[in-house]
Amino acid sequence: MSATLELAKRLIACASITPRDAGCQGLLAQRLLALGFQGEQMNFGEVDNIWLRRGQKPPLFVFAGHTDVVPPGPPDKWLTDPFTPEVRNGLLYGRGAADMKGSLAAMVTACEHFINVHSDHAGSIAFLLTSDEEGPAINGTIKVVETLQARGEKIDYCLVGEPTSQKQVGDMIKNGRRGSLGGRLIVRGIQGHVAYPHLADNPIHSLAPALAVLCAQTWDQGNKDFPPTTFQISNIQGGTGATNVIPGEVEILFNFRYSTEVTHQQLQQQMEEILSQQRLNYELEWTLSGKPFLTAPGSLMTAVSQAVRGITGIDAEFSTTGGTSDGRFIAPTGAQVVELGPVNATIHKVNECVAVADLEILSRIYSRILEILLTE
């Protein structure tokens, strides 16, 4: 069994459902401390965070990742126990195999190989690990970054191990992410009997024209780096459950995934104008989960693409599609940030898995990136 596979299995065996770490960071720290890293716990609330650094000279290269996982769902739907890692037909099964314990294992073994060969490498290497990525993400990476900034610790390069690959490892790399703006809209009417609509005011009927406008709205055209901004309704709740009662209010939850062509303030203003035009009695709450970020072509993107090409022969595609990541907290510091990890076809699904061979490829890619940036 390879060192990467062994470590990945040990991590998967830790039932670290967010915000629990369940011992993952301890396993990783043990391996990294043996390489000369210095560890520092930065726990906030019920969230475990750790910052491990080797060296004090610039440039500082950071591996960033999360040890928490989403709930596995019904265990009886899995081929294997979600927290008993098992290899079947060349695939490692278990919750977190692809998102992102496989990446974490590959990062550590990449460092072990790199430092064994280049013990006197240039610059510094660090790990930023949190158990609060799959949850609210308020006591995790963002708090560690704030602590580092307060004491003047500057990150130059950051590689986040999110599962970015589509069909084979390295075919897609994220060099940015869209912003995420969520909201909760409550429209109030007057409850009543469905047989007497003139004595009531149905908020669902009142809201329907506004929803049609919102769903058909073109918010922007996107640009060469980002697709157009999208608006999606995720939940609608209204009524008592009875078929003969007009509801007194309706609630919707929605989300914008937005490009750099528009700000979250502009989206808020546009939506409020649409709602006001319909003369609705409404209440609106906003939640900004993250602003869009983009890493421009530079030394990190060059190193990552060269490493992928050298190990796999693939010319990787850079993209900003997909969900948010903790890169949104690191990029505003001025760091170059990219994301590269395993194939994402099974993440957050029953029977999450990763190809065993891909773990070794990923470890080699990570090690090669370090060589390009810290020795050449």
Curated annotation (Swiss-Prot):
Q: What protein does this entry describe?
A: Succinyl-diaminopimelate desuccinylase
Q: Where does Zn(2+) 1 bind?
A: 66, 99, 162
What PANTHER family would the database entry show? ACETYLORNITHINE DEACETYLASE (PTHR43808), N-ACETYL-L-CITRULLINE DEACETYLASE (PTHR43808:SF31)
The cofactor named in the record is: Zn(2+); Co(2+)
Classification via InterPro entries: ArgE/DapE_CS, Bact_exopeptidase_dim_dom, DapE_proteobac, Peptidase_M20, Peptidase_M20_dimer, Peptidase_M20A
A single MF term (Gene Ontology):
cobalt ion binding
Q: Tell me its family.
A: Belongs to the peptidase M20A family. DapE subfamily.
Encoded by which gene?
dapE
Pathway where this protein functions: Amino-acid biosynthesis; L-lysine biosynthesis via DAP pathway; LL-2,6-diaminopimelate from (S)-tetrahydrodipicolinate (succinylase route): step 3/3
Q: Which reaction does it catalyse?
A: N-succinyl-(2S,6S)-2,6-diaminopimelate + H2O = (2S,6S)-2,6-diaminopimelate + succinate
Which controlled-vocabulary keywords does the entry list? Amino-acid biosynthesis, Cobalt, Diaminopimelate biosynthesis, Hydrolase, Lysine biosynthesis, Metal-binding, Zinc
Per UniProt, where does Zn(2+) 2 bind?
99, 134, 348
Record-annotated active site: 68, 133
What does the entry's cofactor note say about binding and number?
Binds 2 Zn(2+) or Co(2+) ions per subunit.
Q: Which GO terms describe its biological process?
A: diaminopimelate biosynthetic process; L-arginine biosynthetic process; lysine biosynthetic process via diaminopimelate
| EC number(s) reported in the record | 3.5.1.18
The task this protein performs is described as: Catalyzes the hydrolysis of N-succinyl-L,L-diaminopimelic acid (SDAP), forming succinate and LL-2,6-diaminopimelate (DAP), an intermediate involved in the bacterial biosynthesis of lysine and meso-diaminopimelic acid, an essential component of bacterial cell walls.
Q: How does this polypeptide assemble, per the annotation?
A: Homodimer.
